């Protein structure tokens, strides 16, 4: 038997428009996919995962998490980019966490890697 799948399937049938086009509302209700990307809402999740080469499921009904409780004001120059919900690339977790703290938590992880 294969291992159980992680996450929950999302029923995307209600978001289908004409042909393969999906038109999504702009309301922000972030969800985290099993690909560790944050999607602005369930409709955008459906639109952006429709043609992926692998199945993506919903991991949680909030933005994907990055643990920022233990971060340093002084950051190294290592390059492991993170994309913030503000559309900016952060060179590494430390720099991202500093931005999260400065924004008082309004910035969250959009995805691992560059925007």
Swiss-Prot record:
It comes from the Eukaryota. InterPro entries: Bifunctional_prot_inhibitor (IPR051597), Kazal_dom (IPR002350), Kazal_dom_sf (IPR036058), Prot_inh_Kazal-m (IPR001239). Disulfide bonds join 12-46, 24-43, 32-64, 68-97, 75-94, 83-115. GO terms for cellular component: extracellular region. Pfam families: Kazal_1. One of its GO terms (molecular function) is serine-type endopeptidase inhibitor activity. The record marks 77-78 as: Reactive bond 2 for elastase. Keywords: Disulfide bond, Protease inhibitor, Repeat, Secreted, Serine protease inhibitor. The record marks 26-27 as: Reactive bond 1 for trypsin. Its main location: secreted. It is found in: Secreted. Residues 6-66, 67-115 form the Kazal-like domain. PANTHER family: OVOMUCOID-LIKE-RELATED, SERINE PEPTIDASE INHIBITOR, KAZAL TYPE 2, TANDEM DUPLICATE 1-RELATED. This inhibitor is composed of two homologous actively inhibiting halves: one which inhibits trypsin, the other which inhibits elastase. This is Double-headed protease inhibitor, submandibular gland. It comes from Vulpes vulpes (Red fox). The lineage of its organism: Eukaryota, Metazoa, Chordata, Craniata, Vertebrata.
